[in-house]
From Swiss-Prot:
Keywords: Lyase, Molybdenum cofactor biosynthesis. Catalyzes the conversion of (8S)-3',8-cyclo-7,8-dihydroguanosine 5'-triphosphate to cyclic pyranopterin monophosphate (cPMP). InterPro entries: Mo_CF_biosynth-C_arc, MoaC, MoaC_sf, MoCo_biosynth_MoaA/MoaC, Mopterin_CF_biosynth-C_dom. Its EC number is 4.6.1.17. Substrate binds at L75, C76, H77, M111, E112. This is Probable cyclic pyranopterin monophosphate synthase. Pfam families: MoaC. The active site is at D126. Belongs to the MoaC family. GO terms for biological process: Mo-molybdopterin cofactor biosynthetic process. GO terms for molecular function: cyclic pyranopterin monophosphate synthase activity; GTP 3',8'-cyclase activity. CDD domains: MoaC_A.
Length: 159
């Protein structure tokens, strides 16, 4: 089915029928980065951001976003998730977020992983915007970049 649009036919847009598919283990991992000034990274590491714990807030927001993916992206199926993990790694001038989503279902969870990582990064931006703004109220350094799916797994049972 590579190259064929499954959400569109001659009648218009539709949610793809997945009733005939087998329930199998699904996992997707998405990553993305937010570029921040090194001074902001230091404040986050030291827990000195006024709004509170940046990474804990971003984790919670990302997990909630994963659960709400079908409400945000209209043609995504509601999926009974079995687990979501959001982790962070620091660089000198960035934080890389990773969102891993797992489920046993009939369709993949890559959109959920992308939604989770993106909302986690947006939440970091929101938490640090007061210290990232320049004297004109702009964000010349701050940016979200390189959001992508790094792994997608579909495992059939060997029983």
């Amino acid at each position: 089915m590579v190259g064929r649009l499954t959400h569109v036919d001659e009648k218009g847009v539709k949610m793809v029928e997945i009733g005939h598919k087998d329930v199998v283990f699904r996992k997707a991992i998405a990553k993305g980065r937010i570029r921040l000034r090194p001074e902001t990274i230091k404040l986050i590491r030291e827990g000195k951001i006024e709004k509170g714990n940046v990474l804990a807030t971003a984790q919670i927001a990302g997990i909630l976003a994963v659960k709400k993916t079908p409400e945000l992206i209209p043609l995504c199926h509601p999926i009974p998730l079995t687990g979501v993990d959001i982790t962070f790694e620091f660089g000198e001038d960035y934080i890389e977020a990773t969102c891993e989503v797992r489920a046993y279902y009939k369709t993949g969870v890559e959109m959920e992983a992308l939604t989770g990582v993106t909302v986690a990064l947006l939440t970091i931006w929101d938490m640090v915007k007061a210290v990232e703004k320049d004297e004109h109220g702009q964000y010349p350094y701050t940016r979200i970049e390189d959001v992508r799916v790094v792994e997608k797994i579909k495992t059939y049972s060997t029983q």
